[in-house]
A protein has these predicted regions:
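C-terminal motif of bacterial Sec signal peptides marking the signal peptidase cleavage site
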Residues: 16-19
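Bacterial signal peptide processing site
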Residues: 21-24
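Extracellular/periplasmic low-complexity linear segments
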Residues: 26-93
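N-terminal segments that cap or nucleate solenoid repeat domains
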Residues: 81, 85-143, 462-464, 469-470
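Extracellular beta-strand/beta-solenoid scaffold signature
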Residues: 88-95, 115-122, 145-159, 177-184, ...
């Protein structure tokens, strides 16, 4: 056995981390009472995306009268039910067609919003309420500001904020207006939603969302979004925990299954993006997947786009704090139908993989760490740490000359080549005694730690700091 350590001086890539982000009708209530090109958020790849500086101010009349009608016998209330169904002004912009009262328990009924900047139902001001078996529709009335819609939930079908807590069970929620998210929580609010459907067909809106410190727990949902991510967050972050269910994004290249500017955990669920990346993490945020099935089909067409199933990056829009993006996958299967499996650019990132299965696209690329469309030329590479435990990895890895990679393999097997075209960025490979690396082409790295007997060159050559070592 030949134990050998080959070291080189690590050249840390400079990463320029810019701020981040993305880029009269009647209302009825019935029933139960940088130096180069700098891009904004990746979701702006879709035509429906809007940036901060495109936002317009909104003027909302909180005293505006609305009509409300209820179906007799459809509603069963307990506690202090709000029976008027009148519109009330929000803590910021926008209104609610029906405002839940503290202690209210709704069973059945239909709740509908038709006006601009109006949600069908919601709660604020420390309210605790429950909705069961209801139909909730946002059928018309576009948001007057894409920003207040995306950051504060104005115009969402369901909107909870101001430290309110709402439990939603067995409900049907639809949204068909512009910038009208399905279920939105922010400003210290909490939503527990289970066994429900959320169908969002309007532009500029996601399925279930947190922002501004909101918390959302979702269980066994069927969520479909036609414009933005089925599971998403925005400025101010929060926490989103998903267990079970199916989450599908059907929109354009800016419509991933999961978009994170928060802490997002998904377990035992199926997540599909028909025309975009499966997962996007922006800035100092995370996505953790436990025994999930995911697929993406990146159809990015913008100049300089690098197609990939998972994007870890920092944009310039101000929606996510600068820092390390973290992707963790334990078990489950992820399929890339277009492009590399992972792409890290203009940020630092950590990818943690344990006993997961990856199905590569025809490109055969597993990981790209490089400059891209975000940040300033010359300082917008990526710094990535890849940790694999009890993991099988296949595919090529590319690290450009302003980027870095540290790959740590424990009880894992890697079959592929790293920088097969020659030395570029800093690459460190740490191979445990119970791990292997089988080359599929000549590979060029900066530093190797481990037993070279565990490296099968397969007829190719391994170069460490410019020296052929095997």
């Amino acid at each position: 056995m030949k134990k050998r350590t080959v070291a080189a001086i690590l050249m840390t890539s400079a990463i320029a981390l810019s701020a981040c982000g993305e880029g009269g009708s009647s209302t009825s209530y019935s029933g139960n009472n940088a130096s180069s090109t700098i891009e904004a958020s990746s979701e702006l790849d879709s035509a429906e995306g809007a940036s901060n500086d495109q936002a317009t101010d909104i003027q909302t009349d909180g005293n505006k009268d609305t009509t409300a009608s209820s179906s007799e016998g459809e509603k069963k209330q307990k506690g202090k039910g709000s029976k008027s169904g009148k519109k009330s002004e929000d803590s910021s912009e926008g209104t609610l067609a029906y405002t839940l009262s503290d202690g209210e328990e709704i069973e059945g009924g239909t709740y509908t919003a038709e006006n601009e900047d109006e949600s069908a139902i919601g709660a604020a001001d420390d309210t605790v309420a429950t909705i069961t078996g209801a139909t909730i529709n946002k059928i018309s009335g576009d948001a007057t500001s894409a920003d207040t819609s995306s950051f504060e939930g104005v115009n969402a079908a369901v909107r909870v904020y101001g430290n309110a807590t709402v439990t939603i069970e067995d409900c049907e929620i639809t949204s068909d207006a512009e910038n009208a998210t399905g279920v939105f929580v922010y400003d210290g609010g909490t939503i527990y939603i289970s066994d429900s459907t959320v169908d969002v067909t309007g532009g500029g809106a996601g399925g279930i969302q947190v922002a501004g410190g909101g918390t959302l727990y979702a269980e066994n949902l069927t969520v479909t979004s036609a414009s933005k991510a089925a599971i998403r967050s925005d400025r101010g972050g929060g926490m989103l925990v998903v267990t079970g269910g199916t989450y599908t994004s059907t929109g354009s290249s800016g419509c991933p299954a999961i978009y994170s500017t928060a802490e997002i955990t998904v377990s035992d669920a199926e997540c599909v993006s028909e025309n975009s990346r499966a997962v996007i993490i922006e800035g100092k945020n995370s996505v953790t997947l436990e025994n999930c099935t995911l697929s993406g089909n990146d159809q990015s067409t913008k100049e300089g786009s690098i197609k990939a199933n998972v994007l870890l990056y920092q944009s310039s829009s101000g929606d996510a704090e600068d820092g390390t993006s973290v992707f963790t996958m334990n078990g489950g299967t992820m399929t890339s139908n277009s492009g590399a499996m992972f792409y890290c650019t203009n940020t630092s990132s950590v990818i943690n993989l344990t006993d997961a299965t990856f199905e590569l696209s025809d490109t055969g690329e597993f990981l790209i760490v490089s400059a891209g469309r975000w940040g300033s030329d010359g300082s917008n590479g990526g710094n990535c740490v890849l940790n694999a435990e009890e993991q099988t990895i296949e595919g090529t890895i590319t690290v450009d000359d302003i980027s870095s990679l540290e790959m740590n393999l424990e009880q894992s097997d890697y079959t592929g080549a790293i920088n097969s075209s020659g030395q570029a960025g800093t690459v460190v490979v740490n191979l445990s005694d119970d791990s292997t690396w089988t080359l599929t082409a000549d590979s060029y790295i900066s530093e190797f730690e481990g037993d070279l007997d565990n490296v099968d060159t397969n007829g190719y050559h391994l170069y460490v700091d410019g020296v052929e070592v095997k």
